[in-house]
Amino acid sequence: MLKTRIIPCVLLKNSQLVKSIEFKDFRTIGHLTSTMRIYNARNVDELIILDIDASKSGEIDFESIEDLAKECFMPLTIGGGIKTLEDIQKILNLGADKISINSKALEDMDFISKAGNRFGSQCIVCSIDVKRKGDQFCVYDRGNLLEKSPLELALEYEKKGAGELLLTSVDFEGKAKGYDLELLKIFQNKLKIPLIINGGLSKPSDGVEALNLGADALAGAYIFHFSKYTPKDVKEELARQGFAVRLL
């Protein structure tokens, strides 16, 4: 049985690690090196770092990525500003294990296939940000709501060769009120690739609810920095509920 992964998902901004609320109102988590050492000590399963400066400017902070990778002793996913296969090659050469693509995948779905063919689909994570519009869920990209079904987009990404999907609820992101379960229900039993749910994790029982609705891995930021819970607390609750986790 595959083990459920607990994955801190944090943002890189001005060479600092931060978290946000609804992709705004940023709050500093800490310096790159010290934060990596905390994650190492807490034995998290993986780490996702999204470079939001690069997403806006198109200039990837390779120096910070190198600093992160040197201190990171767990599988590391880097996203933000990736536009070319050469960008991916450089990020992987610096020590990352996977890359996450969002806007580039929307612009050019064939890029997913090209990246998967060159580097292996197992290291290609496609990211979809979702925001509600009334009672509908829409894909959210750089401040714009797209008239595109998140599930349809995810299925297209899967067909193009994505290895995993990172699904983030913008409405729930950073609010610490649990995952968007209505969003998860739309995806339940629809994908063959692993689904990482992100946005809203506030306590271990939130993770149980998400896994019961088909999530394969749990991502979060607030819970691991601004609450009393640690990754171990989440894992222990999952284990009590019968889910396979990596406990040391």
Curated annotation (Swiss-Prot):
<comment type="pathway">
    <text>Amino-acid biosynthesis; L-histidine biosynthesis; L-histidine from 5-phospho-alpha-D-ribose 1-diphosphate: step 5/9.</text>
</comment>
<dbReference type="InterPro" id="IPR050064">
    <property type="entry name" value="IGPS_HisA/HisF"/>
</dbReference>
<dbReference type="GO" id="GO:0005737">
    <property type="term" value="C:cytoplasm"/>
</dbReference>
<dbReference type="GO" id="GO:0016829">
    <property type="term" value="F:lyase activity"/>
</dbReference>
<protein>
    <recommendedName>
        <fullName>Putative imidazole glycerol phosphate synthase subunit hisF2</fullName>
        <ecNumber>4.3.2.10</ecNumber>
    </recommendedName>
</protein>
<keyword id="KW-0963">Cytoplasm</keyword>
<comment type="subunit">
    <text>Heterodimer of HisH and HisF.</text>
</comment>
<comment type="similarity">
    <text>Belongs to the HisA/HisF family.</text>
</comment>
<feature type="active site">
    <location>
        <position position="129"/>
    </location>
</feature>
<dbReference type="InterPro" id="IPR004651">
    <property type="entry name" value="HisF"/>
</dbReference>
<dbReference type="Pfam" id="PF00977">
    <property type="entry name" value="His_biosynth"/>
</dbReference>
<keyword id="KW-0028">Amino-acid biosynthesis</keyword>
<dbReference type="InterPro" id="IPR011060">
    <property type="entry name" value="RibuloseP-bd_barrel"/>
</dbReference>
<keyword id="KW-0456">Lyase</keyword>
<dbReference type="GO" id="GO:0000105">
    <property type="term" value="P:L-histidine biosynthetic process"/>
</dbReference>
<dbReference type="InterPro" id="IPR013785">
    <property type="entry name" value="Aldolase_TIM"/>
</dbReference>
<dbReference type="GO" id="GO:0000107">
    <property type="term" value="F:imidazoleglycerol-phosphate synthase activity"/>
</dbReference>
<dbReference type="InterPro" id="IPR006062">
    <property type="entry name" value="His_biosynth"/>
</dbReference>
<comment type="function">
    <text>IGPS catalyzes the conversion of PRFAR and glutamine to IGP, AICAR and glutamate. The HisF subunit catalyzes the cyclization activity that produces IGP and AICAR from PRFAR using the ammonia provided by the HisH subunit.</text>
</comment>
<keyword id="KW-0368">Histidine biosynthesis</keyword>
